[in-house]
């Protein structure tokens, strides 16, 4: 019997930013962690900033996504995002600096509501980048912060 793979497509406003096939796609949706394999039931979910693992055989592509929407059919996973980066292209020092800057804004008692909302978003994105980096180094963890 021939192995059946999911078609995986990650798209941004600039077009397709990742295409591949997978035995399994794992990600965090609005209802929690999901493992998606060929034949999965159809679903549509929002995604927070986080890690998407696209596994085929012994190889896993680890992707940081800025958040978005995932559409699943029995044969395809389409992820629509504002931004996506492969974990191997992420810079740990930059992610840590972004995290520290966001925390500084959140500590400021004079920060406006708008500044606090933006800092919370940047903090979640920096944490997601760090998780993607850790995941690509074999240290995958999933934790709600």
Swiss-Prot record:
Compartments (UniProt record): Cell inner membrane
Membrane topology: Peripheral membrane protein
InterPro entries with a match to the protein in the record: ATP_synth_F1_dsu/esu, ATP_synth_F1_dsu/esu_N, ATPsynth_dsu/esu_N
A GO cellular component entry from the record: proton-transporting ATP synthase complex
Alphabetized SUPFAM superfamilies for the sequence: Epsilon subunit of F1F0-ATP synthase N-terminal domain
Keywords: ATP synthesis, Cell inner membrane, Cell membrane, CF(1), Hydrogen ion transport, Ion transport, Membrane, Transport
Pfam families: ATP-synt_DE_N
Gene Ontology MF term list: ATP binding; proton-transporting ATP synthase activity, rotational mechanism
PANTHER family to which the protein is assigned, alphabetical: ATP SYNTHASE DELTA/EPSILON CHAIN (PTHR13822), ATP SYNTHASE EPSILON CHAIN, CHLOROPLASTIC (PTHR13822:SF10)
Quaternary structure and interacting proteins, as annotated: F-type ATPases have 2 components, CF(1) - the catalytic core - and CF(0) - the membrane proton channel. CF(1) has five subunits: alpha(3), beta(3), gamma(1), delta(1), epsilon(1). CF(0) has three main subunits: a, b and c.
NCBIfam families assigned: ATP_synt_epsi, PRK13452.1
Function (record text): Produces ATP from ADP in the presence of a proton gradient across the membrane.
Protein name in UniProt: ATP synthase epsilon chain
UniProt source species: Francisella tularensis subsp. holarctica (strain LVS)
Name of the gene encoding the protein in the UniProt record: atpC
């Amino acid at each position: 019997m021939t192995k059946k793979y999911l078609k995986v497509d990650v798209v941004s406003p600039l077009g397709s930013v990742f295409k591949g096939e997978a035995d399994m796609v794992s990600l965090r949706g609005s209802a929690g962690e999901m493992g998606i394999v060929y034949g999965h039931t159809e679903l549509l979910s929002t995604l927070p900033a986080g890690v998407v693992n696209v596994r085929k055989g012994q190889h896993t592509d680890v992707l940081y996504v800025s958040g978005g929407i995932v559409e699943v059919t029995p044969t395809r996973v389409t992820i629509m995002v504002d931004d996506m980066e492969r974990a191997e292209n992420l810079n740990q020092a930059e992610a840590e600096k972004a995290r520290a800057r966001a925390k500084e804004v959140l500590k400021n008692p004079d920060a406006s509501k708008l500044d606090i909302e933006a800092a919370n978003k940047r903090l979640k994105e920096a944490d997601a980048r760090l998780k993607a980096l850790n995941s690509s180094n074999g240290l995958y963890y999933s934790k709600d912060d």
